[in-house]
């Protein structure tokens, strides 16, 4: 489980340009941000996510509660967390303790967020939903993100991101 931030300003990824020329990109003039909390369910191959206006303890606790209520209690839920400050807050530790009988929390080493498998999906999401595009308002970005998230949870869609179930 992890969170990512999506912004209104354009992100340029793999763009053709003539040598010596830099592409000029229009921008809306001000940055606005939106946050997505997400967890990948290895059993169902689906992404459980929640949009949030703020990336803080309250949003994190709300997502953990939503996550734990959306999965069956047959097996423990493995939660992989990085060292964001709000993951270590008193309220965050309280909600993780509340669900400790149904979950196993693994803390990543500091500055090693790339070890979290969902980071690969966040890169895919940003490439497909908002790279090389100009959005006038943050609602357009959110709509684009929602469409890619919907594709991800459609198991028959050929454009979805597929996780490798084996590691070398």
Name each region found by the language model.
Residues 118-168:
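C-terminal anion-handling pockets and recognition modules
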Residues 81-83, 90, 106-128, 139-141:
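RNase H-like two-metal-ion nuclease catalytic core shared by retroviral integrases
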């Amino acid at each position: 489980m992890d969170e990512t931030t999506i912004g209104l300003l354009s992100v340029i990824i793999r763009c053709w340009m003539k040598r010596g020329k830099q592409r000029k990109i229009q921008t809306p003039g001000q940055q606005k941000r939106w946050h997505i909390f997400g967890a990948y369910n290895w059993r169902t191959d689906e992404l459980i996510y929640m949009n949030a206006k703020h990336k803080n303890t309250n949003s994190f606790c709300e997502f953990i509660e939503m996550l734990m209520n959306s999965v069956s209690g047959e097996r423990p839920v493995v939660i992989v967390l990085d060292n964001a400050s709000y993951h270590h807050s008193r309220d965050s530790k309280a909600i993780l303790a509340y669900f400790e009988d149904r979950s196993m929390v693994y803390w990543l080493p500091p500055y090693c967020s790339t070890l979290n498998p969902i980071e690969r999906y966040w890169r895919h999401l940003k490439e497909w939903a908002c790279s090389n595009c100009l959005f006038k308002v943050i609602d357009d970005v959110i709509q684009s993100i929602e469409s890619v998230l919907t594709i991800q949870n459609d198991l028959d869609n050929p454009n979805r991101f597929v996780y490798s179930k084996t590691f070398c």
